Structures are given as C-alpha cells and as structure tokens.
Swiss-Prot record:
NCBIfam families: PRK11187.1. Homodimer. Polymerizes to form helical filaments. Keywords: Cytoplasm, DNA replication inhibitor, DNA-binding. InterPro entries: Arc_rbn_hlx_hlx, Ribbon_hlx_hlx, SeqA, SeqA_DNA-bd_C, SeqA_DNA-bd_C_sf, SeqA_N. This is Negative modulator of initiation of replication. It comes from Aeromonas hydrophila subsp. hydrophila (strain ATCC 7966 / DSM 30187 / BCRC 13018 / CCUG 14551 / JCM 1027 / KCTC 2358 / NCIMB 9240 / NCTC 8049). Its main location: cytoplasm. Negative regulator of replication initiation, which contributes to regulation of DNA replication and ensures that replication initiation occurs exactly once per chromosome per cell cycle. Binds to pairs of hemimethylated GATC sequences in the oriC region, thus preventing assembly of replication proteins and re-initiation at newly replicated origins. Repression is relieved when the region becomes fully methylated. It is found in: Cytoplasm. One of its GO terms (cellular component) is cytoplasm. GO terms for molecular function: DNA binding.
Length: 169
C-alpha cells in the first residue's frame, strides 16, 4: 500500500463518495475511476510519501477532554455537539464513514435534516457545528453516549478514550 498527498478539497470529495462503513480509499477511487478491484496498477517511480490520515493521536479530542470545557458546559446536548464537532475535525473521512450508524427505528446522522425528520416525528434535528452533518437530539443522555460510542468505535478509537468521552457527555 502506498500513501499519497492530496489537497484538502480532493480529500473531502473522495470522503464524500463513501457508500458504506469500512470502504477504503482504494475502493472508493476504483469505483470512481471504474476500475475492477483485481486490476494490477502499473509500476511507477516511488514518490515522497506523506503521513496517512488516521485517528492515531486524536489531538483535538484529547485537548477538549483535558481543557475542562466539557465539564464547564451545563447541558448534555452542548457537550454532545462539542464532541461530535471535535470528532469531525480530527478525522472528517472517518466521521463521514461512521455516520452510517442507525438505531432500530431511527437514522442518527444525515447531511439532510429532512431525512432525520422522516425517521421519526420527534427527532429534533440540529446541525453539528462546523460540519455538514445534522444529528437527532431528542434522545436522553444515555442514548447520546451510545451514539458517540458507536461512532467512535467505527472511527477506530480505543475503549479507554471512548469511555472517557462518553463519561464527559
């Protein structure tokens, strides 16, 4: 596997073309370029590689937890929104892929608030700050914690960090 450096706009375009959780960048590009999965790529000269875009350190999330900002916030909905916004900033592609999670009867995340309203009359969709996503908000704190835990698990965060974040909501 090779790593390439992309401009942000191209990176976000590729991420927006994700169809399901776990779809790799290679799968997305093959689909967009209409290339079969087993076709061998031509051998080219190696290029300078950039660091792959991964959750790895989750610097923004750690900074949010360490700053005490979440503890200062009185309302769980505001803490929930801060966490979601930070997760998106840390890893937009992983967040986009992970937003495919759904409840038994409801869609939790969407780029379209009407899609959330269609999954239930009392979902109260709100925009996630600094992201193109909307999230249902008419849920209890436990459900919000569960949504964040599912989202973070899909994004590749470890159990310890997930527990720490959910405990702060």
């Amino acid at each position: 596997m090779k790593t390439i450096e992309l401009d942000d706009d191209l990176y976000f375009y590729i991420a927006s073309q994700t169809r399901h959780i776990g779809e790799s960048a290679s799968d997305i590009l093959r689909r967009l370029l209409e290339q079969p999965a087993n076709q061998a790529a031509p051998v080219t000269e190696p290029v300078t590689t950039a660091q792959p875009h991964t959750v790895a350190d989750a610097m923004g999330l750690e900074a949010l937890l360490d700053s005490g900002e979440l503890q200062k916030e009185e309302k769980s909905i505001n803490r929930f929104m801060q966490v979601l916004s930070t997760l998106y900033r840390d890893d937009p592609v992983g967040f986009t892929q992970a937003t495919e999670i759904k409840g038994r009867k409801r869609v939790y995340f969407s780029r379209d608030p009407d899609a959330l309203r269609a999954s239930g009359s009392t979902t109260k969709p709100k925009p996630v700050p600094e992201t193109p996503f909307w999230v249902i908000t008419n849920t209890n704190t436990s459900r919000k914690q569960n949504m964040v835990a599912q989202l973070m698990t899909s994004m590749g965060y470890g159990d310890e960090v997930i527990a720490r974040v959910c405990g702060a909501i």
